[in-house]
Amino acid sequence: MPQSAEHVLDHVELFRGPEYQQMLAKKKIFENPRDPAEVERIKEWTKTAEYREKNFAREALAVNPAKACQPLGAVFASVGFERTLPFVHGSQGCVAYYRSHLSRHFKEPSSCVSSSMTEDAAVFGGLNNMTDGLANSYKMYKPKMIAVSTTCMAEVIGDDLNAFIKTSKEKGSVPADFDVPFAHTPAFVGSHVTGYDNALKGILEHFWDGKAGTAPKLERKPNGAINIIGGFDGYTVGNLREIKRILELMGIQHTVLADNSEVFDTPTDGEFRMYDGGTTLKDAANAIHAKATISMQQWCTEKTLSFAAEHGQDVLSFNYPVGLSATDDFIVALSRISGKEIPEQLARERGRLVDAIADSSAHVHGKKFAIYGDPDLCYGLAAFLLELGAEPTHVLSTNGNKAWQEKMQALLASSPFGQGCQVYPGRDLWHMRSLLFTEPVDFLIGNTYGKYLERDTATPLIRIGFPIFDRHHHHRSPIWGYQGGLNVLVKILDKIFDEIDNKTNILGKTDYSFDIIR
């Protein structure tokens, strides 16, 4: 063998050894072999316009959808509250997926439990699982709140969360006055952004509307505070901290709902923090009195904002404010709603972003980009690219709907750089592959899964989105606000300059442009 206890090889090198190469060659012959020439022919055919037409005609199949399921979003929202334990009514395997997905992106532990439903619960219902699960969770993990959501299994058989939680309390699983908000989050409809919305609405409904009949409904007494909702966001650590900094600079009384910026960025100091930070339960209840609720992501919070509006609040939503104009709109709205002046420090930060754009616009201007991801992220990035004079040629969102498509088209139509750009709601990354082959662009913007498109189509990938598994700590830096816009600009420019270097580094042939100044 090529390694020993004294010489352990990384997997990158290990499988290149002669023993593994021989094994893999035999495996290829044994497992459904195909003529290499035929494989090559089909591969080339999948790059054609003819194949693209067939690809876009499919209806009953998704290949590499750029979305996740509802319970992931529910877990993400739930951990944003003080000492809250997400409890997913379903199987252990599903919950392992949510935990690993969040842990691999944020490089932090992700605490979540399940009711461990198996075959018997799928037939007879999961009441016993709920009863035992709530009791064990309450005793073992000492939460202040347990937020319940569901998986496909529980939804298909029709388990009633409200009834199950009441019965569990009657059986003594948790105290009668213990907070157990819930939301039905069927994974076979919607996506993780839907689950975020459902879970957040469920938690606010619990506190504002009488805790499932166990307490009086709260009576709203309006004050001057503003509620902020970040939405499902892979940059929640950096972005929420940036938004809170802006609010504090402006002197605005505020509550960030579902504030998970601390639990996904805990320090290593000898103390394990299963729960850290989060919106306090008292603040979650008092949020009913706020003057307004502002969502940073429209498509993440449609139900929650409607719920806040029903309780008499002014509501306002943005679409992932990246760049100059989007941040202007956000800060002006804060000033208008709160009556506070915009501080000089923010004006200076704006000027620095304008200066950076002016310094680098020649390198970005006219470049073609393809973008995929969640609806609000795609909108925010496309808007910023238009500001930079770039062309968001393909904008694809698997969980985007018709309303999102219309809003995106209006954005593209508002700029000369958006002419000829196309929007693709409900499409997946196999559709994007056809687009990149038949209508090539200069750069691709998306999450880690875009690296396969980068390999197949040779389109350089700029990693922005969720999840980012193969790069570390991107989530710690904001991409909202003026500072966030500068961070995104740097990401784009770094990739542009890397590509220039890659294309000019052959000694004596292309290195006449291998410059140290760009």
Curated annotation (Swiss-Prot):
Provide one Gene Ontology biological process annotation.
Answer: nitrogen fixation
Q: Does the keyword Metal-binding apply?
A: yes
Q: Which GO terms describe its molecular function?
A: ATP binding; iron-sulfur cluster binding; metal ion binding; nitrogenase activity
- InterPro entries according to UniProt: ChlB/BchB/BchZ, Nase/OxRdtase_comp1, Nase_comp1_CS, Nase_Mo-Fe_CF_bsu, Nase_Mo-Fe_CF_bsu_N
Can you supply one Gene Ontology CC term for this chain's record?
molybdenum-iron nitrogenase complex
Quaternary structure note = Tetramer of two alpha and two beta chains. Forms complex with the iron protein (nitrogenase component 2).
- For this entry, the protein name equals Nitrogenase molybdenum-iron protein beta chain
Tell me the name of the encoding gene. nifK
